[in-house]
Structure formats: C-alpha cells, structure tokens
Amino acid sequence: MIGFAPISAPDALAEAAARARQDALTKPRGALGRLEDLSAWVASCQGQCPPRQFQRARVVVFAGDHGVTRSGVSAYPPDVTAQMVANIDGGGAAINALADVAGATVRVVDLAVDAEALSEQIGAHKVRRGSGDIATEDALTDDQTAAAIAAGQQIADAEVDAGADLLIAGDMGIGNTTPAAVLVAALTNTEPVAVVGFGTGVDDATWSRKTAAVRDALFRSARVLPDPVALLRCCGGADLAAMAGFCAQAAVRRTPLLLDGMAVTAAALVAERLAPGARQWWQAGHRSTEPGHQLALTALALDPVVDLRMRLGEGTGATVALPVLRAAVAALSSMATFAEAGVSTACDDAGATEPPES
C-alpha cells in the first residue's frame, strides 16, 4: 500500500520571527536579497529563530539504468552507470568533490543499475536490473513501483533518523533525462520538443531519437493520467520512483531538502502529487540547462538558488547551492541587531528608509 502521512506546513511563527529579526539586523532592510528569504525558510523548517547551522547535510544519489537507452538517446553507453556508481562510492566523482567543499556527505544507492550491485549496502534497495523501455513498454510492474517508492521513503527515514538535518537528492543513470522529460511533459501538458534537451551533450540526430522516444512514451502515458503512481510505473523507472518517495518522505519528516536538476525535479513533480504540500519543504538548488527543468520548477513554484548553466546531475547543482544556504543561516544567526551593536537606524525625519550602499 502506497501512502504518505499528511504534510504539515513549516512553522509560520518561526518564519515571521526570522523576517522581523532580518529587519532589525545591522543592514538596510532587504539588503541581503534572496538570503533573507532563504534564512526565513530554514527557520520555518527548523521551527526556531535564529536557525541552527546545518550539522549533517546528506546527499543521496539514486542510480538506475533505463531500457530506452537502447533507442540511442544518450551520448554514453549504459555501462557507464555502474562505473559511475563505483566512482561515486570511491569518492572520485564531481558530487564527492563538491560535497566535500559544501560540508556534506554522500551516499549512493542502486535501485535499477543493469549490473550486479557493487555492495550489499549500495544494493539493499535494488528493485530490478534496468527499467523497461518506456517507448514501448512499462518501466516497472505494479509491485516494483510500490517497492521503489517505499525504498525512497525508507531511505529518507533512515537518513533523518541518523541525524540528517538537510537532504539533497541526486541522480545517476545514463538516459534518465528521457523518462524525466516524459514525466514533466505529462504533468505540465507540454509537447516533447519543448521538454527535451541535449542531456549529456548529444548531437542533433540523438536529440531527434530522444524526442521521438519521449513522444511515444507520452502517448502511452495518456491512459494512466493523472494517477502519479501509474505514471511512474508506465513512464518513470525505479530510480525516479524512489526519488519521488524520498522527496515526499523528507517533507513528512519535516526535513528541508534541496532539489537538483532535471531528473530529481521531475521526480519531485510526481512527489508533490503523492504528498500534496511537500514542496513547502523544498528549495530548488539550481536551474539546469535542460528546458524541461524550468517547466518543472515553474509548476512547483520554486526559484533556483543558483544558475551556473550546470547539467551534470548527481546532486551537484544542489550541492553548490548549499554554501549559499549556509550563508543565509549564518547572517541571520550571527549578525548583531542595531540595538545590540549600538548602531543608528535609518533617519525617519529625513524620510529615508534605508542607508545607501557603502
């Protein structure tokens, strides 16, 4: 049985206190821009003002292969997925380097890599070897879909129970932007050509094959809409279903989460339908160059923290945003107020509301 506990909203009183404190800090009102909004969001998620600095930020990378790669939709062969799982586990991937700088740790989980699991721990939630070719068949069976969503829930629970106070969802899977594009197109009523990007750097011919595969899968998806579970079964994959479960359960557990790029945000779009209101607990770490990513962000009403023209996946874009989130927390919690510092506020009699930039 697939189900999530009702989502409760972040703490509105803590958010209000954070905004009031921002206005009292030794700076012009609003001078820290988006950092002020982010700090208020963290305070609301933690239910306290000032908020605590993150002590255990955790990146979870969900890995899986996709049968649609047989249609030639990617610039890389499918066996790269298994090789990259080993690379991430060994600490040699981009996500490892960026997480180290950002003060986060990394875990990789194998949901549907088309190879034997690298280790018992990595493969503890493995659902199958490779998801089906969504252009011609369902990605998963009913039981596999339920198992993958449950795996995401269990992984989120395990991380929060172990002390994680911020979660980042990442992905690893050759060809996974193809099912991700289908999910976004289906849930935003968008044509394939508007959601399909160049992924890992495909050429025009590969893009055309990818668009055709998305078109065929989207046609198949029409019979299951608007059921989010059936959509994952039909046109998703075990990794995407697990990410959806993970994102939704993070919200159930009242734990803030940073979304990464196209694959993760497509899964989050489904997660919002599995657990309405979950998006209140998420921030979009970055904006990918994949066109479907902006469509998904718009549908979720999320603004990216950074935009660095990244399109790697793995959780890298979200992890780059983590230091920005840390800076937001530090400013709100560590700065002095005007009263504490003995600094004069804006001159009311002169009609000024803010001192000029120095």
UniProtKB/Swiss-Prot annotation:
Catalytic residues (positions): E314 (proton acceptor)
Catalytic activity: 5,6-dimethylbenzimidazole + nicotinate beta-D-ribonucleotide = alpha-ribazole 5'-phosphate + nicotinate + H(+)
An annotated Gene Ontology molecular function: nicotinate-nucleotide-dimethylbenzimidazole phosphoribosyltransferase activity
Any GO BP: cobalamin biosynthetic process
Enzyme superclass (EC): transferase
Domain of life, per lineage: Bacteria
Keyword vocabulary terms for this entry: Cobalamin biosynthesis, Glycosyltransferase, Transferase
EC number from the UniProt entry: 2.4.2.21
Pathway annotation: Nucleoside biosynthesis; alpha-ribazole biosynthesis; alpha-ribazole from 5,6-dimethylbenzimidazole: step 1/2
InterPro entries in alphabetical order: Nict_dMeBzImd_PRibTrfase (IPR003200), Nict_dMeBzImd_PRibTrfase_bact (IPR017846), Nict_dMeBzImd_PRibTrfase_N (IPR023195), Nict_dMeBzImd_PRibTrfase_sf (IPR036087)
RNA-binding found in the keyword field: no
One Pfam family cited in the UniProt record for this chain: DBI_PRT
Classification via Gene3D superfamilies: 1.10.1610.10, 3.40.50.10210
Summary of the function given for this chain in its UniProt record: Catalyzes the synthesis of alpha-ribazole-5'-phosphate from nicotinate mononucleotide (NAMN) and 5,6-dimethylbenzimidazole (DMB).
Similarity field: Belongs to the CobT family.
PANTHER family linked: NICOTINATE-NUCLEOTIDE--DIMETHYLBENZIMIDAZOLE PHOSPHORIBOSYLTRANSFERASE (PTHR43463:SF1)
Designated name of the protein: Nicotinate-nucleotide--dimethylbenzimidazole phosphoribosyltransferase
Lineage: Bacteria, Bacillati, Actinomycetota, Actinomycetes, Mycobacteriales
Gene that encodes it: cobT
